[in-house]
Amino acid sequence: MAGEWACLLVSLVLLWGAAGSRDGFLLDRNFCRIKCSFLGSNSMCADRCTVLGASAGHCNNYACFCTDLRDRVKIWGDSVRCRKP
């Protein structure tokens, strides 16, 4: 019985860890990608991603892209550049 509970607990932790983070572009309030267009944008993007709990961040296609973001952060993962609310 204890072995079954331990196995179940490990499975839940692994599933939570896999579902708890993802990669994507940061969005502003209008669901537009946060732009990287100024000198120093790459380091600002990396800093912003780190503050949000991501493992890394960099400018990609002129937008701020974070890796291993938490689910609570709103991101957009495909090629759409801006969506109106």
Swiss-Prot record:
Summary of the tissues where the protein is detected: Expressed by the venom gland.
Domain LCN-type CS-alpha/beta as annotated: residue spans: 22-83
Disulphide bond pairs: 32-82, 36-59, 45-64, 49-66
First-listed, main subcellular location of the protein, grouped into a coarse class: secreted
InterPro entries reported in the protein's UniProt record: LCN-type_CS_alpha_beta_dom (IPR044062), Scorpion_toxin-like_sf (IPR036574), Scorpion_toxinL/defensin (IPR002061)
Gene Ontology terms for molecular function: sodium channel inhibitor activity; toxin activity
Family indicated by similarity: Belongs to the long (4 C-C) scorpion toxin superfamily. Sodium channel inhibitor family.
Protein name: Putative sodium channel toxin Ts37
Organism: Tityus serrulatus (Brazilian scorpion)
